[in-house]
């Protein structure tokens, strides 16, 4: 028996196969047992642990605070809306797989969003224009910052030649960048339409900005419909990472009237993020911040404080559990000093006055003769027709689109014929052996030549910084004595040209070959240039190849005007004349001065409470619609604002500076009285022509005379001669000294705050006081340049006999419980105590007499004191100004009004009467402000300055 067992043992141990089989069997039994435990005994527990695979912490955006006027009228608020978002929560084997998966998901989502009538967010530095071409939104430094962001550089200076992409990053075109994004970076299938590839690229780029910040969702579309919400919710399991979020959409009331004050919000830029995150690490590159105006200045109060929560999601993104929830804190509310009703009505009245001036000056002519007298300048109606094209009221690029109307196609055909002639002529000019010098060209071809050379410089084909301004040929070009050929050829010879822009050859190329290449480049480059096309249109209109009635009819076709089939067809077939029609459009303001960008097209008014220094109105015209810039910025609208020749993004109330004209004479009177070069009783005889200085300036009344006047009468009649003498005397004292006179004028301008910013919280330019010619400076000319808001503070100081305020647009900030957490408001900067009551009285009396002489203030219920002013501009209509206050005996409000190129100060005075009327509750002024009526302007009173 023992031997038997020993043999069995020897057999088992000696067989390797048997031993291995034994081991495998043992392990198999263990594995089966373990699987039984995992799947049967503890399967439910492990499944739960699998589902709770991802833990992430999310930020919860705070609701932005609202902005109110002084009376609690809401100007900026929030509406709850649904947004489609995407978070890259997928797992991929490679970048190629990732690009393919995301492209498919985004294609699906974008298609459904658009089919539901919703818009994709496209706040991006490139947009697709109406011709279907890629175009940059910004220019200059902003464009370079965008390029740096695209190519992953922290600084603009890091832009370089990219050997991998074979392009100069600093000069990458919109097409270059979109090719890089769609093809090389994100691998978006070429089978998709251009608009779809663009939309996917924009979303992918925005997603990529947050690659280092986990669990930050990117918005695909804001403020979507319930239909889109339902689609996303129903298909969420297939649309990995796509979700619906509740977001606040910023909305603005009466935005055009308030845009310059309130500004708008937008997505934080790289530079803004880098700056703001230094002090607050809760910022992300998806955040919305104030981008301009009070929204920007008060962002830290309006923004609120983000909340947070920890969420657990399963492998497909389904929410399993939420923990550690912290509610966001709503932003604080900001209250302004501005009276919303007054602001809105002043804006309306200002637009009406400018429209009225246009109606007075438009004449039924192609051109008008040049005149030496600014008030005689008229506007030929053909300039109005061209303005429809030149300022992009009509989109000429739509004429070549498949859905262009027959009338648009007719106009395009006429234009094409004209353009062919122009390009052929330019080609001959550039290759001529006997080129014509610039001054001998027709005005038409001078304009083309100027445009081409300027554009070549703007695009760094001709290198501005290389040009020697003292070079003889450069001087010949500047003085119009050189031909375009000679100038461009010389630029090549002097290495003032970047030849890589038009040739791939860089060595062993002679000047003739380079010139021929550049000439060919010019013809090719300007055959597809919207600005150059507009110049051609200008001449096509003058030659009646394109007619005014056609352009007016096309405004109906393109939706610029509300559809009226009968009127549209009457214009199209010539049964209705364009001249009367366009005048009716201006009168009804269905076409506004801001759209036409003729002279005048802009203006401003600032009104201040003289007793407190509070800003009541700060109006600039034209404004813009903040709603189209906030939230998901409409890039095409932003571009239209930047290219609009009336400059709606520019605040004329706080930034525009012109000579103050005769409104400065109260400052000169103060200087003269305080320095004792005159007294209130001093009589100066107006001799018409002032011969004590070499330029022999004349009084505006010359060859007549005002006779003998004191300072109050000189203000009343705006006598230039009187104030020439004051300026001369200020420069006296031991012999005439120009610097002494300027120094004394500057001293009192400084006391009145005319050479400083006023303290408001939005962008403001600093006014400047004359640095030469005290005789001319004393009447507000020389190189005086003062903003409207500085003039308003100045006249407030005069009305209050010397109180100069530091201004503020703000009143207070309060939290959600209504508790005031910070007070704002004006502060007394200076009390000027240099004049006695009699001297102030003389200035006030003169201003009262000005208003009494103006028919604008006839039968006005409140006594007004004021001063008109005219700032002269060579070869243009004069700027029109008026400053004043009321009531005369006990001032409550002061104002300054400026209409750039407004012809005569009477126009500024006329509309200022209505501004004051609205403030004092005058029913006629309020009714006019609220009506659709536009009245023609009238000559008012006898003052001319």
Segments and roles (model prediction):
Residues 417-526, 685-711, 736-789, 799-821, ...:
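Penicillin-recognizing serine hydrolase domain
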Residues 34, 72, 106-108, 232, ...:
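Active-site SXXK
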Residues 65, 70, 247, 251-273, ...:
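Active-site beta-strand/loop architecture of penicillin-binding DD-peptidases
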Residues 54-56, 86-99, 214-222, 282-285, ...:
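Second-shell loop/turn segments in exported
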Residues 2-586, 595-604, 610, 727, ...:
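Membrane-proximal periplasmic segments of bacterial cell-envelope enzymes
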Residues 332-333, 377-427, 431, 649-651, ...:
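Conserved catalytic neighborhood of penicillin-recognizing serine enzymes
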Residues 371, 619-621, 629-632, 658-712, ...:
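Short, glycine/proline-biased beta-turn/loop segments that scaffold the active-site neighborhood
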């Amino acid at each position: 028996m023992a031997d038997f067992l020993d043999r069995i043992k020897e057999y088992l141990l000696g067989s390797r196969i048997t031993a291995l089989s034994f081991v495998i069997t043992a392990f198999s039994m263990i594995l089966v047992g373990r699987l039984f435990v995992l799947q049967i005994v503890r399967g439910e527990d492990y499944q739960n642990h699998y589902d709770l695979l991802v833990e992430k912490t999310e930020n919860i955006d705070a609701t932005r605070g609202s902005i109110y006027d002084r009376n609690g009228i809401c100007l900026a608020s929030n509406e709850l809306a649904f947004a489609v978002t995407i978070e890259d929560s997928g797992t991929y084997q490679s970048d190629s797989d990732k690009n393919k998966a995301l492209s498919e998901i985004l294609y699906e989502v974008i298609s459904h969003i658009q089919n539901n009538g919703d818009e994709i967010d496209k706040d991006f530095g490139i947009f697709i224009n109406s011709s279907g071409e890629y175009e940059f939104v910004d220019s200059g430094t902003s464009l370079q910052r965008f390029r740096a962001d695209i190519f992953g550089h922290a600084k603009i200076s890091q832009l370089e030649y990219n050997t991998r992409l074979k392009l100069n990053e600093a000069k990458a075109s919109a097409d270059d960048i979109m090719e890089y994004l769609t093809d090389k970076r994100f691998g978006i299938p070429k089978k998709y339409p251009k608009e779809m590839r663009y939309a996917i690229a924009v979303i992918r780029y925005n997603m990529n900005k947050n690659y280092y910040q986990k669990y930050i969702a990117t918005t695909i579309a804001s403020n979507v419909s319930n239909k889109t919400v339902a689609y996303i919710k129903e298909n969420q399991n297939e649309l990995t990472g796509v979700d619906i979020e509740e977001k606040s959409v910023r909305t603005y009331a009466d935005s055009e009237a308030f845009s310059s004050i309130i500004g708008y919000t937008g997505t934080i830029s790289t530079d803004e993020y880098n700056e703001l995150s230094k002090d607050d690490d809760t910022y992300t590159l998806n955040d919305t911040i104030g981008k301009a105006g009070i929204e920007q200045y008060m962002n830290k109060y309006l923004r609120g404080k983000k909340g947070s929560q920890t969420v657990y999601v399963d492998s497909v993104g389904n929410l399993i559990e939420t923990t550690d929830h912290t509610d966001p804190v709503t932003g604080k509310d900001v209250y302004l000093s501005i009276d919303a009703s007054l602001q809105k009505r002043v804006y309306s009245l200002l637009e009406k006055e400018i429209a009225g001036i246009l109606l007075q000056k438009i004449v039924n002519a192609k051109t008008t003769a040049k005149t030496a007298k600014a008030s005689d300048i008229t506007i030929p109606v053909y300039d109005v027709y061209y303005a429809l094209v030149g300022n992009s009221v009509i989109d000429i690029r739509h004429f070549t689109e498949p859905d262009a109307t027959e009338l648009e196609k007719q106009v395009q055909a006429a234009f094409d014929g004209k353009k062919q002639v122009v390009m052929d002529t330019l080609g001959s000019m550039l290759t001529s052996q006997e080129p014509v010098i610039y001054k001998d060209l027709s005005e038409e071809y001078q304009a083309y030549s100027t445009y081409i050379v300027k554009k070549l410089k703007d695009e760094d084909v001709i290198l501005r910084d290389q040009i020697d301004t003292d070079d003889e040929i450069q001087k010949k070009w500047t003085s119009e004595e050189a031909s375009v050929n000679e100038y461009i050829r010389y630029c090549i010879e002097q290495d003032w040209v970047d030849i890589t822009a038009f040739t791939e050859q860089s060595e062993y190329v002679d000047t003739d070959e380079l010139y021929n290449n550049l000439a060919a480049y010019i013809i090719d480059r300007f055959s597809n240039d919207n600005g150059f096309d507009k110049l051609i249109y200008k001449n096509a209109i003058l030659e009646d190849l394109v007619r005014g009635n056609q352009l007016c009819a096309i405004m109906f076709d393109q939706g610029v005007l509300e559809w009226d089939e009968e009127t549209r067809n009457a214009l199209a077939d010539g049964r209705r004349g364009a001249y009367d029609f366009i005048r009716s459009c201006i009168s009804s303001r269905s076409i506004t001065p801001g759209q036409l960008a003729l002279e005048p097209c802009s203006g401003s008014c600032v009104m201040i409470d003289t007793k407190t220094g509070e800003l009541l109105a700060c109006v600039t015209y034209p404004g813009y619609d903040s709603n189209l810039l906030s939230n998901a910025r409409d890039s095409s609208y932003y571009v239209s604002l930047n290219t609009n020749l009336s400059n709606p993004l520019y605040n004329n109330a706080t930034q525009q500076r012109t000579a103050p004209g005769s409104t400065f004479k109260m400052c000169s009177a103060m200087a003269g009285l305080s320095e004792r070069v005159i007294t209130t009783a001093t009589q100066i005889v107006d001799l018409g022509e002032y011969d004590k200085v070499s330029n022999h300036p004349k009084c505006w009344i010359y060859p007549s005379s005002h006779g003998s006047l004191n300072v109050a009468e000189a203000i009343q009649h705006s006598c230039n001669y009187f104030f020439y003498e004051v300026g001369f005397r200020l420069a006296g004292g031991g012999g005439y000294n120009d610097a002494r006179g300027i120094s004394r004028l500057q001293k009192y301008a400084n006391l009145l705050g005319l050479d400083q910013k006023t303290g408001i919280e939005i962008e403001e330019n600093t006014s400047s006081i004359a640095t030469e010619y005290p005789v001319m400076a004393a009447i507000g000319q020389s190189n005086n340049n003062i903003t409207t808001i500085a003039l308003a503070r100045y006249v407030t100081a005069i009305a209050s006999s010397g109180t100069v305020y530091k201004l503020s647009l703000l009143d207070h900030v309060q939290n959600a419980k209504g508790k005031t957490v910070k007070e704002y408001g004006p502060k007394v900067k200076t009390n000027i105590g240099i004049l006695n009551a009699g001297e102030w009285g003389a200035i006030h009396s003169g201003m009262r007499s000005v208003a009494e002489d103006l028919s604008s203030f006839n039968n006005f219920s409140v006594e007004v004191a004021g001063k008109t002013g005219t700032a002269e501009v060579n070869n243009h209509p004069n700027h029109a100004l008026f400053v004043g206050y009321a009531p005369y005996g006990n001032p409550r409000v002061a104002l300054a009004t400026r209409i750039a190129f407004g012809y005569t100060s009477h126009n500024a005075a006329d509309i200022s009467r209505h501004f004051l009327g609205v403030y004092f509750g005058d029913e006629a002024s309020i009714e006019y402000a609220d009506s659709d009526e536009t009245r023609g302007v009238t000559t008012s009173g006898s003052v001319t300055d």
